[in-house]
């Protein structure tokens, strides 16, 4: 009999494990065994936090039990680093929520103004330099297009700059969730990618995001039939 996967939920920058609690409870209601992994997003870099996740698993997880991973924002980049650095674990399926796989324009502005606000996370993650996703990993990407949050101030400024150039991007390229551009969430190696009407933080409490995350973990793809009703 195949062992049931454990779902590890990984929060983003300036957050703690508790922020993933509602999503975890919704996955638990669907029968998933979950754990909310907490880490120091400001003080430590992505590789240190990946190593600590590995240490936690060595103490609390049996290597024969498959692992599914769900990461919000920076948490998704930790997933990418972790699955590359620690291939010994049986990784099932991964879902990233609002993760800037191609780097973050918003984080770049903040880094130039006040580096301490993004800390070590910018240097080896939010600048777009995370290791490529291994080919065997099944990854689903959820992006949001509701521009709510403090990060929208930087992105609105950036959009105005882009509109003044001769090579103005399409309206689709200007969509963001208040912190991360939809375009920044796209990664060629992803198995599936969807855009939902949610903001960067709002996606963590959104029922549709939870339902789509659950569906991907179960089927290896998102439920595109449900997207027609949004």
Spans of features found by a protein language model:
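Alpha/beta-hydrolase fold catalytic core
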Residues: 1-5, 21, 28-32, 223-230
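Serine-dependent carboxylesterase/thioesterase catalytic core
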Residues: 5-18, 26-41, 46-140, 150, ...
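Short, functional N-terminal and low-complexity linear motifs
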Residues: 17-25, 177-184
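C-terminal catalytic-base region of ester-bond hydrolases, centering on the histidine
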Residues: 136-230
